[in-house]
Structures are given as C-alpha cells and as structure tokens.
Amino acid sequence: MITDKTECNNPLFGRILTAMVTPFTENGDVDYELAIKLSNYLFENGSDGIVLCGTTGESPTLSWAEQHDLFIAVKGSLDASCKVIVGTGSNCTSEAVEATKKAYDSGADGALVVVPYYNKPPQEGLYKHFSSIAKSAKDLPLMLYNIPGRTGCNLLPDTVKKLMDFSNILSIKAASGRIEEVTELRAICGSELSVYSGDDSLLLPMLSVGAVGVVSVASHLVGLQLKEMIHSFQSGKVSNALAIHEKLQPLFKALFMTTNPIPIKAALELSGWDVGNPRSPLSPLNNDMKKQLSFILNSL
C-alpha cells in the first residue's frame, strides 16, 4: 500500500536490488528450485530486494506463465522484508497492463516497467503508456526503467515529472549511461523520485549527485562490498567508498564484456552456481572471455 511519496527518501525498495538471473536446467527449462536458493543467498549477502524477469533475467525469452511461476516460487521462499520486484514491461501497452495487474494480484512488492522497445513511441505515447499501467494497479509501486541503448527510445525528465502525478510512480532505474541523467531528473522531479543507478560502474558517481541505490548485476557476486560502499559514502567515509569502487571496477567491466547476462551467468558458474546457459538467441561466454573472467574473479 502506498501512503506517502516521501517514503522515497528512505527508499521503499532499499539500496541494493539484484537484477537476478533466471536459472535454467540442462534441458533449458526454468530451474525454480535453484532460483529459490539463489534469491535467498542474495538476500543474505547484501541485497535488499530482488528484481525478477528484467534484462538480466532474460525476460524476452520467458513466457508470461514462466514469469508468474518464477515470481510465486521466489516470493514464497523469501523473508517478508526482502522486496521482490517483477519486470512487467512490454512494447504493447495492453500486455504491460495485464502483467502489472497480475503482479499486483500475486503479491509483488513492485513492478519494473521498461520503456517500450523497438516501436520508439514519442513522449506523448510514453506518457499514455505508463499512465495506463499506473492506473491499472494503483497500490503497486512502480519503477520506471529507462535504458535507451536497448530500447532505442529515451524517457525524458519532463515526461517523468508528469508521470509523478500518479502516486504509485515512485522511482526510476536510470540506465542511459549518463551521470547527468540523475542531475536532470532531480532538478525537474525533486527528491520525491528515487533514482537508482542501472549500471554498477556508475553507482558511486551517481550517489554523489543524488541516486539512492542500484539495480545491480555485480551484487550476485559482491553484494556485501556494494553495501559497504554505499554505507561508507552515506556516512562520509568517501575515501573508503572510492577504494571499494576502484577495486570492483575490473569486475564491473568484465560483466559487460559482451551482452548481459552472458558474463554474469558464466561468473556464477565459475563461482559454483550452475545457473545454466542463456536461452537462444543469446549464447554462452566463449572460452577466451571465460578465462579473462576467471582471472578477475580470482583477484577479488
């Protein structure tokens, strides 16, 4: 239930949200049992919440039924204090509305709604799209997701400001790769909007200009270090935060040496988590890249 947008200043979803991979069996089926184990491990190792069925979770290759079953399995296994946010975005408004309603009815703590991809709507179309979603589940907190490098469409701060008239639009995952995106959003939308970095490597710089946390890939591996970095920054120990940031940069870079989530799935395998290969059209990490990744993991 949403009561007051000022909750965003003590962010409703927490500081570290792991964009969790979707584990697959050797046959390519969703491995729900392993998803339960992994999500609980993440919560015990620095994550305040879990984001399911996003980019890292390979949502384009999951059926709506698989996404629903994955949420039910994970949500039912976690402590109630761990927020579970579900990706419900689509480039078809009616599909996104239906998925968001279902997430709300199933007990999700929030929904991650990506900017429509491929069809490249104008700002008016984006406003109508997100308005329809917000109206469909008025008590479900929504996190907008701006990632123009994948969608081919940029959600502008002025449009976000208009969307904040809806009480359940509380936050945004800023994944344009531009630090100034945070500054622009805060200048126009104010501190009521919680801005999350969508890029681990930009977390510390974005914190310095007003971001509240991160939707992270690296937290699969270094969640406690990320938690320490954020705490250090918030408590004025900036030099310690910077030291952690610098130490983790090779990992941040390696996890995007090719298309996400290919590297993180390989990294988890190297760390003892047999989460399976990505579904086609993504392919497994090649051997040369896997050797580079192994070297970096061993140096942490």
From Swiss-Prot:
<dbReference type="GO" id="GO:0019877">
    <property type="term" value="P:diaminopimelate biosynthetic process"/>
</dbReference>
<comment type="similarity">
    <text>Belongs to the DapA family.</text>
</comment>
<feature type="site" description="Part of a proton relay during catalysis">
    <location>
        <position position="55"/>
    </location>
</feature>
<dbReference type="InterPro" id="IPR005263">
    <property type="entry name" value="DapA"/>
</dbReference>
<dbReference type="InterPro" id="IPR013785">
    <property type="entry name" value="Aldolase_TIM"/>
</dbReference>
<dbReference type="GO" id="GO:0008840">
    <property type="term" value="F:4-hydroxy-tetrahydrodipicolinate synthase activity"/>
</dbReference>
<feature type="active site" description="Schiff-base intermediate with substrate">
    <location>
        <position position="173"/>
    </location>
</feature>
<keyword id="KW-0220">Diaminopimelate biosynthesis</keyword>
<feature type="binding site">
    <location>
        <position position="56"/>
    </location>
    <ligand>
        <name>pyruvate</name>
    </ligand>
</feature>
<comment type="subunit">
    <text>Homotetramer; dimer of dimers.</text>
</comment>
<dbReference type="GO" id="GO:0009089">
    <property type="term" value="P:lysine biosynthetic process via diaminopimelate"/>
</dbReference>
<keyword id="KW-0963">Cytoplasm</keyword>
<feature type="binding site">
    <location>
        <position position="215"/>
    </location>
    <ligand>
        <name>pyruvate</name>
    </ligand>
</feature>
<feature type="site" description="Part of a proton relay during catalysis">
    <location>
        <position position="118"/>
    </location>
</feature>
<dbReference type="InterPro" id="IPR020625">
    <property type="entry name" value="Schiff_base-form_aldolases_AS"/>
</dbReference>
<protein>
    <recommendedName>
        <fullName>4-hydroxy-tetrahydrodipicolinate synthase</fullName>
        <ecNumber>4.3.3.7</ecNumber>
    </recommendedName>
</protein>
<dbReference type="Pfam" id="PF00701">
    <property type="entry name" value="DHDPS"/>
</dbReference>
<keyword id="KW-0028">Amino-acid biosynthesis</keyword>
<dbReference type="GO" id="GO:0005829">
    <property type="term" value="C:cytosol"/>
</dbReference>
<comment type="pathway">
    <text>Amino-acid biosynthesis; L-lysine biosynthesis via DAP pathway; (S)-tetrahydrodipicolinate from L-aspartate: step 3/4.</text>
</comment>
<comment type="function">
    <text>Catalyzes the condensation of (S)-aspartate-beta-semialdehyde [(S)-ASA] and pyruvate to 4-hydroxy-tetrahydrodipicolinate (HTPA).</text>
</comment>
<keyword id="KW-0704">Schiff base</keyword>
<keyword id="KW-0457">Lysine biosynthesis</keyword>
<feature type="active site" description="Proton donor/acceptor">
    <location>
        <position position="145"/>
    </location>
</feature>
<dbReference type="InterPro" id="IPR020624">
    <property type="entry name" value="Schiff_base-form_aldolases_CS"/>
</dbReference>
<keyword id="KW-0456">Lyase</keyword>
<dbReference type="InterPro" id="IPR002220">
    <property type="entry name" value="DapA-like"/>
</dbReference>
